[in-house]
Structures are given as structure tokens and as C-alpha cells.
Amino acid sequence: MALDPADLPDDVRGFLTERHLATLTTMRPDGTPHVVAVGFTWDDEAGLVRVITGGASRKVAHVLAGSPRAVVAQVDRARWLSLEGVPVVSRDPERVAEAVRRYALRYRQPADNPQRVVLEITVDRVLGRA
């Protein structure tokens, strides 16, 4: 079922706060999908998915090489969501700190990583049911 990212139902927003891992799909330069497990956070006000990662990761390289879209998919039994949108990589210390803060609230405090960046996906399509 397609959902409006700007007006998600309460059960969907609740599902996005539960402690689950997800998959992140980016596109390799040859057009094939690269799928990895990630922790992520959802910013309902900004319509953003945030994924913290090392600056030298393949997912970052794919986005910097022009991966036009990214998808984060979270599944828990019969509940599932796919959040699709346009990815960007930010090295801005304030944006990275905000992503780390949100990650720590949902999962745990991540280890220090001076090379950390944040992958931000502006979500324009949500599919699923929670």
C-alpha cells in the first residue's frame, strides 16, 4: 500500500521508532543493486531517513558516484515499510551529530568514528503496512 510520506499514520510512525534493523539499497555504477543491513532513523518533520556510516563505505561511494535513488526497507513479520528517495552524503559536523543523536536514541550510542558521515534520504515514496 502506498503512503504519503508527509502524513504517515500513527502505527507507521510507531513502527519507525521500534528497534529494528533494515536494508539499504543503493545502485552501483554498473546499475546493479547494492543491499546492506543498516540501522537508520526517521525524521518525520523533515521527511528524512538518516544512516550513519564511514566515509569510505561502498554505500557512500555509490551515492557520490550518482546513485539517483536509495531505499531503506524495514521488516518485522507481517509488518513492512519501504522508504524511497533521493540520497545525499553530508560531512557537515552538525548534521552528523544530529544523526548520531537520533541513532543513539533508537539503538545505542555508536563508537566514535572521526570518518563518520551521514547518508540522508529525502523520502518521496513510502510503501508498506505496519
Q: Where do the model's predicted regions map?
A:
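Short, basic/aromatic recognition patches
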Residues: M1-A22
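Charged, gly/pro-rich active-site loop segments
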Residues: M1-D7, R77-A130
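Short helix-to-loop capping/linker segments positioned immediately adjacent to catalytic or ligand/cofactor-binding
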Residues: D11, T23-M27, R106-D112
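Sterically constrained small-residue positions within well-ordered secondary structures
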Residues: F15, G31, W42, Q74-D76, ...
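Short beta-strand segments
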Residues: R19-G55, R69-V72, L83
